[in-house]
Amino acid sequence: MRKPGNSTSNGAALAPAGRLLLHLAPGLRQAIDPDDIFFVEATGDDTRVRTRAARALRDVRPLGEIEPLLLRRGFLRTHRNYLVNARHIRQVRRRPAGEDWELKLDPPVNRVLPVSRGAVAALWAAFGED
């Protein structure tokens, strides 16, 4: 019998205490606290998960399969290839070329990631701006 709160509507498993199970390889799972994730990047058929410890973990699932698990935990889809933990966004700025936007993440990651034009409104809304 399934315990309440241990799976999502799409059947993906949640680890205890709100942790996320990364699928590192077939038959190998690792629990991680979503707050420790800075961003998730699509890399072909799988996904790269960048953590607070500045490690990159590989999840064998595509980004679209992980997305619903993270959107309800404060992550934003900022680009077709990226989900970003809003709690780790340090700065949002226009790109030097003009119209497009980018964001910079907190240390120790300090990565600069693109923000697609279609994601700008949702980004401002997440921070309570118009």
What are these regions (language model features)?
Residues R2-K3, W124-D130:
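Mature exported/compartmentalized surface modules and terminal targeting/interaction regions
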